[in-house]
Amino acid sequence: MRILAIEASGPVAGCALWEDGTLTAEYSVQYKKKHSQSLVPMLSEMSGMVDLELSSIDFIAVTKGPGSFTGLRIGAATVKGLGLALDKPVLPVPTVDSLACNLYGTDRLICPLMDARRQQVYTGIYENRDGLKVLRPQCV
């Protein structure tokens, strides 16, 4: 199974290819929050590096928030366009869940934090035994 993942909810824009349980490729840029200008060229360059035909992917995943409102709209619009053009399903993923996946393989509790401003954070608590399990869903 091939999953193309797109992240644009924060200061770093990125795309990745997950293939049969392995991260095959990833590309990220943190440059002045210009996701609208960098996301599609990143996707094109990453696809070229691994000889990926976009028609061969099974799903397209995108972070759905919390995060930058503008970044979320850019990510959603990009993925919606790709999904329609390629006739592929789109999977929205909570941003905090995607952060927790950075520690995939650890046997400890995972508690990612995102700045929600106004002295608050977005967080969740996860356990990673036999797959990522949400113990406490994202909250402020």
What are these regions (language model features)?
Residues 11, 65-66, 116-119:
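Short glycine-rich anion-binding loops that position phosphate/pyrophosphate groups of nucleotides
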Residues 30-38, 69, 73, 77, ...:
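Residues at secondary-structure transition points
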Residues 1-64:
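N-terminal beta-alpha supersecondary unit
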Residues 43, 78-82, 99-100:
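Buried hydrophobic packing segments
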Residues 48-55, 84-93:
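Phosphate-handling active-site elements
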Residues 22, 34, 89-140:
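Surface "functional belts" at beta-alpha junctions
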Residues 16-18, 74, 124-125:
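Short amphipathic alpha-helical segments
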Residues 59-90:
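DPxDG-like acidic metal-binding loop motif
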